[in-house]
From Swiss-Prot:
It catalyses: L-proline + NADP(+) = (S)-1-pyrroline-5-carboxylate + NADPH + 2 H(+); L-proline + NAD(+) = (S)-1-pyrroline-5-carboxylate + NADH + 2 H(+). Belongs to the pyrroline-5-carboxylate reductase family. GO terms for molecular function: pyrroline-5-carboxylate reductase activity. This is Pyrroline-5-carboxylate reductase. It holds the Pfam family P5CR_dimer. HAMAP family: P5C_reductase. Pathway: Amino-acid biosynthesis; L-proline biosynthesis; L-proline from L-glutamate 5-semialdehyde: step 1/1. GO terms for cellular component: cytosol; plant-type cell wall. It comes from Arabidopsis thaliana. The gene is PROC1. Its EC number is 1.5.1.2. InterPro entries: 6-PGluconate_DH-like_C_sf, NAD(P)-bd_dom_sf, P5C_Rdtase_cat_N, P5CR-like_CS, P5CR_dimer, Pyrroline-COOH_reductase. It is found in: Cytoplasm. One of its GO terms (biological process) is L-proline biosynthetic process. The keyword Ion transport does not apply.
Length: 276
């Protein structure tokens, strides 16, 4: 059967699962003007609070997932990994080649998604929690039946909550170790920087504000200047100055090696979980 292109000017998006990630994506899509809220839907079975949340910014909320699939051209499975198989198989008879299917469930491979759904027009996306503030680092991989045009539509949707890049699915465990788990590493770093500020005599509130803004500013410099972070580091480390003294302490504590080890360990754990 011929795959029909999704109408770019009128397509509708439906979320299976009405949790925080679905909310973040939906809010981003609406706020950025990618889609009006009346072209987005989800289903809430019993949690009235989640219904109120989605309805508060104009999203259509149905009572069943079957209604979501029926009304949508792009169906995004935004449920926990342990229940995604059940969610997909229960809707199998409603899915077709005329719909783009998307999963954001960590560790669930395209082969499994395609087998459970009976469809190969699937796209796997790995977002991360900063999607909640429009600063996600997402990676996507296309299934065997998904077209480049399908990928462009999904990139447009997830681009509304941050940056989205394309990669081979075999890289997803490493992606999990870096961008998936990475926010936690940075939260820890911000907390440690703030604690250092307190130890040096700063009030807690001031220390935390300076720490978080410093990390944000440094990340923005890397992103916007295109300079290698090592070059930016060299630019701020004067001979015999304060910054190189601090960098020296980080090097003595194996700061870089510890971060590298954290990424590798998380990637290894992701690989183990996906094989279990």
């Amino acid at each position: 059967m011929e795959i029909l292109p999704i109408p770019a000017e009128s397509f509708k998006v439906g979320f299976i699962g009405a949790g925080k990630m679905a909310e973040s994506i939906a809010r981003g899509v609406v706020a950025s003007g990618v889609l009006p809220p009346n072209r987005i839907c989800t289903a809430v079975h019993s949690n009235l609070n989640r219904r109120d949340v989605f309805e508060s910014f104009g999203v259509n909320v149905f009572s069943t997932s079957e209604e979501v699939v029926k009304e949508s051209d792009v169906v995004i499975f935004s449920v926990k990994p342990q229940v995604v198989k059940k969610a997909v198989t229960e809707l199998k008879s409603k899915l077709s080649k005329n719909k783009i299917l998307v999963s954001v469930a960590a560790g669930i491979k395209l082969n499994d998604l395609q087998e459970w759904s009976g469809q190969d027009r699937f796209i796997r996306v790995m977002p991360n929690t900063p999607a909640a503030v429009g600063e996600a680092a997402s990676v996507m991989s296309l299934g065997t039946g998904a077209t480049e045009e399908d990928g462009a539509i999904v990139a447009m949707l997830f681009g509304a909550v941050g940056k989205i890049l394309k990669a081979d699915e075999k890289m997803f465990d490493a992606v999990t170790g870096l961008s998936g788990s990475g926010p936690a590493y940075i939260f820890l770093a911000i907390e440690a920087l703030a604690d250092g500020g307190v130890a040096a005599g700063l009030p807690r509130e001031l220390a935390l504000s300076l720490a978080s803004q410093t990390v944000l500013g440094a990340a923005t410099m890397v992103s916007k200047t295109g300079k290698h972070p090592g070059v930016l580091k060299d630019d701020v480390t004067s001979p015999g100055g304060t910054t190189i003294a601090g960098v020296h302490e980080l090097e003595k504590g194996s700061f870089r090696a510890t971060l590298m080890n954290a990424v590798v360990a998380a990637a290894k754990r992701s690989r183990e979980l996906s094989q279990s």
